[in-house]
Amino acid sequence: MKFKAVYALLISSFILMLSVYILTSNTLYVQLVHLLLPSSIAAQSQPTLPSQSTSSLSSSSSSVSSLPDVFQKVENSVVQITSTKSNPNEVIILNGVPQTGRSTALGSGFVYDNQGHIVTNYHVVSGVKKADVTFTDGNTYSANVVGKDPNSDLGVLQITGDFSEEKVVSLPLANSSAVRPGEQVIAIGNPFGLSGTITTGIVSQKGRLLPNPDTGFSISDAIQTDAAINPGNSGGPLLNTKGEAIGMNTAIFSSTGIYSGVGFAVPSNTIAKEVPLLIKNGSYAHPWLGVSGGKISPDLIKAVGLPTNYKGVIIGSVQPGSPAEKAGLKGLTQDNDNGATHTGDIITAVDGHPVRQIDDIINYIESQKNVGDNIKLTVSRDGKLVELTATLQARPQTSSLSSSQNQDQLQPPGLGPIPELPQIPGFPPLPRLPPLLP
């Protein structure tokens, strides 16, 4: 009896210690992982080919009665994409001659129109000019990469050779602005090379800023979901229960590279806005303001003497030569003589729309503005409201950004410091702090 009592006490103590750790730990160890699958670990897959066509945002009110009906409706519009690129870090000996190695990876995509255009993620077709597209009936077609946008992680291919327009069924795009948290969603793709895999979940949240390690900028207005998506799902559709694409699965937060309940999709409105220009021009110019900043904290409100319910985005830094600098926006500064810190401007509204966090500004610019458009900024400066107008420029290349811009970043809400994690083979690592610069 005495041993049992001691044993029970030890178990109780362990549970108490674990509970305290869970309640007090505020660090979430995560890594942003693209969902591209190296073909060396892919299972054998037997993909099918489409049969209809439409593109652009759908406003259909007809509802599909069941998940099997949704899958049957769209399965012929979802494809597997196989891309092969040279690997300069690998040398193989073939017939006694050293040659650069090649790596092959698998991703997903879906039919955009009956002209044979396929949309997928940029990271699925990065570094290649051609790829193979396999439908669920097993038919494989060669396709040329006709457009890429690393900033939004979008890529467009076009099937070459003969194909039947009647059999290429485009997937209708829903209006992602109308999506609500809690809605049921369906993900279809080729996780681990298992073609035509369907998983379900809900919209966990919308309007997320998704850090993009390839560019240093963020993907705006991303949809968060708990539908299971894994390596190989990259570029596949996230669907509503009508069988319309509300987004494109692109990444997960995970410490292992495997699904852990938090996935992200590029919204369908971004696809609808960009893809026609990617087909036409091969690239897309993102509008850019050139600031970094963050939500006003209660401590700052108290220190500056603002009303307790004050809302807005405080500017941390302004990029030299940016539209923000030309418009006269001021960031956080420090007096070299006495070391005093001067608070930056506080943006309270853009084009008359109130803003509460940097996400609001970035999402508005990305969804509503184009390069060359003017944007009106309502700014609180030294206790007074001023109106400034900025003319948006094309977003610069990452390499041309100053180091201060790359470093002056904020963490995603609710996440503690992101530690350095070992890189998972085949997947890019997440920068320590995700960028929040429009």
Name each region found by the language model:
Residues 3-7, 24-311, 320, 358, ...:
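Serine-dependent protease modules
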Residues 9-22:
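Hydrophobic membrane-insertion alpha-helices, especially the h-region
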Residues 118-119, 324-359:
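Conserved PDZ fold ligand-binding element
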Residues 140, 385-387:
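A structural signal for beta-strand boundary/capping segments at domain termini and interdomain linkers
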